[in-house]
Amino acid sequence: MATRRELANAIRFLSMDAVQKAKSGHPGAPMGMADIAEVLWRDFLKHNPSNPHWADRDRFILSNGHGSMLIYSLLHLSGYDLSIEDLKQFRQLHSKTPGHPEYGYAPGVETTTGPLGQGITNAVGFAIAEKTLAHQFNRPGHEIVDHHTYVFLGDGCLMEGISHEACSLAGTLGLGKLIAFYDDNNISIDGHVDGWFTDDTQKRFEAYGWHVIPAVDGHNPEQILEAVKQAQAETTKPTLIICKTIIGYGSPNKANSHDCHGAPLGDDEIAAAREFLKWEHAPFEIPAEIYAQWDAKEKGQVAEKAWEEKLAAYAKAYPELAAEFTRRVNAELPANWAAESQAFIEHLQANPANIASRKASQNAIEAYAKLLPEFLGGSADLASSNLTLWSGSKPIRAVENADGNYINYGVREFGMSAIMNGIALHGGFIPYGATFLMFMEYAHNAVRMAALMKQRSLFVYTHDSIGLGEDGPTHQPVEQTSALRLIPNLETWRPCDQVESAVAWKAAVERKEGPSALIFTRQNLAQMDRTAEQLANVARGGYVLRHCCENQNCPDLILIATGSEVELAMKAADVLDAEGVKVRVVSMPSTNVFDKQDAAYRESVLPSHITKRVAIEAGIADFWYKYVGFEGRVVGMNSFGESAPADQLFKLFGFTVENVVAKAKEIL
């Protein structure tokens, strides 16, 4: 029987060999954390390699994602569908083993990690989801949700500010099933961290309210084993296990230095490591005995079967709850969703209201949350401004309301967004979280990660323009809406009234293949009249709101607008119409969605031969030339805003009927 060290060495040499073959990568972290991983994965981790999507599996997140060969080695050795050939294709085009772990490639990878600090933050989201789902569905004697979230992280993760946001909240919420392993090796890319990272990490996390187990020898399996047992015994606080490790452990000449952090060791050093660790096997060769001891398939199948029996007993005792649990973990919408949500939209169209779109958003939440118990909302300390609370909101606390449906994220925009991604990845919830659009900047990378991972995170942004007014340019978005539109696989909506707002929310809920950004105003907006056909076309991202004649070839001019500027476009069209100009107005609440429509529909809205076009949006002007062409005009922002009442600002920056008409006449 192989020793624990030999089992860990299998990770080390797979990592060394794969990085060497790829001619790039990070061998140091996998070599340094191999002993910790061996104990966690073989003694504690509840998982089934034959079914990576088992609902009650433990979640493992590698926050220091540059050490990706660690998780790839673990998945391969324990029996997931990740072959030795897949490891040989590390970092190659279209492989299952990209340079950083990516969700949806290798089975068993729970989240995409790489930008440091986001993995630990995703892990907080996973742990919130587990605890909340457990309190919503578990009943005495029927614990169908009962799993841990384990996360590996390094110095870089703890230096990133997002780790403070996430770990502070995790302590406040008492996430007792979150267990983090800190790879305390004192090395980062630039060298020994003494010159730039001297925090007392133990005191830092104790101040957050975490249970901290310090000074664990990360190469001593007995100490690691005991630390995990202690961590599992503490059920009211998250645990940080501080593991003293040697980066590149086993490399005689490069261990404990930054030389092994982010580059192949080299053939000579790998040969020296083989001799040092007494590993007599060829590259990518693992003895059958070691494979047998690592294989977790049988153990995992037994564990899942036992859970299925528990679920069957639960279904017998609580059939309605069991059906609801199954629906939610399968990410299926309620049977009445389509009809009820459409009825709500039609009701709004039939009952006009001139309200701020942020208020329209709250009304949509109120209507939809009653249909969607999986909604898990929140705001970054701006609930009264973002209007994200509804009549059934139940804020989650560490002990009280652990079965709630709303998270007070505090002033943590980046943390909130990455936590939402963890909640979405976990399953059972549709997370939404809000802040001012300007503060999206703090969270931009987490929004991008949601899009990359194709997760249904709903990012709500209010106070969307200079319409914010007196708070001034520090709080007035200019380029933010366009920046969001440029993120691949993110659908960005900027609705013009309560109807478009409700449609945007509906589209976001129904979109399973990616996130949405929902952008709303502070100021009131007039509701637009629509025919049934126009109402149906709102969901297509852009549509003709004002026709000038039956024949689509007839317009002299097309005005394109979004959000608060749609009303302005309609008023300008009335003035031009009175002067004999045939004007079509296109409302385009989502350029992303409109661009995905078939060519015939896009041509019906924006006929290519009608080149006289003006776009109107209280955001950066440059974005709109893709629609109006170089000969067109854009009424938009080309500078930062000012501190003044909103009506004065709109006039100052040219968002007036007179200016829109003047711009139109320049090209007529």
From Swiss-Prot:
Enzyme Commission code: 2.2.1.1
Domain of life: Bacteria
SUPFAM superfamilies assigned: Thiamin diphosphate-binding fold (THDP-binding), TK C-terminal domain-like
CDD domains hit by this protein: TPP_PYR_DXS_TK_like, TPP_TK
InterPro entries: THDP-binding, Transketo_C/PFOR_II, Transketolase-like_C_2, Transketolase-like_Pyr-bd, Transketolase_bac-like, Transketolase_BS, Transketolase_CS, Transketolase_fam
Keywords: Calcium, Magnesium, Metal-binding, Thiamine pyrophosphate, Transferase
GO terms, molecular function: metal ion binding; transketolase activity
Cofactor-binding details, from the entry: Binds 1 Mg(2+) ion per subunit. Can also utilize other divalent metal cations, such as Ca(2+), Mn(2+) and Co(2+). Binds 1 thiamine pyrophosphate per subunit.
Sites marked Important for catalytic activity: 26, 261
Positions with a binding annotation for substrate: 26, 261, 358, 385, 463, 471, 522
Gene Ontology biological process terms from the UniProt entry: pentose-phosphate shunt
A Gene Ontology cellular-component term: cytosol
Catalytic center residues: 413 (proton donor)
Positions annotated to bind Mg(2+): 155, 185, 187
Keyword Iron-sulfur (UniProt): no
Cofactor: Mg(2+); Ca(2+); Mn(2+); Co(2+)
Annotated catalysed reactions: D-sedoheptulose 7-phosphate + D-glyceraldehyde 3-phosphate = aldehydo-D-ribose 5-phosphate + D-xylulose 5-phosphate
First-level EC class: transferase
Gene3D superfamilies, per database record: 3.40.50.920, 3.40.50.970
Oligomer status and interactors: Homodimer.
Family: Belongs to the transketolase family.
Function: Catalyzes the transfer of a two-carbon ketol group from a ketose donor to an aldose acceptor, via a covalent intermediate with the cofactor thiamine pyrophosphate.
NCBIfam families assigned: tktlase_bact
Protein name: Transketolase 2
Annotated organism of origin: Pasteurella multocida (strain Pm70)
Gene name as annotated: tktB
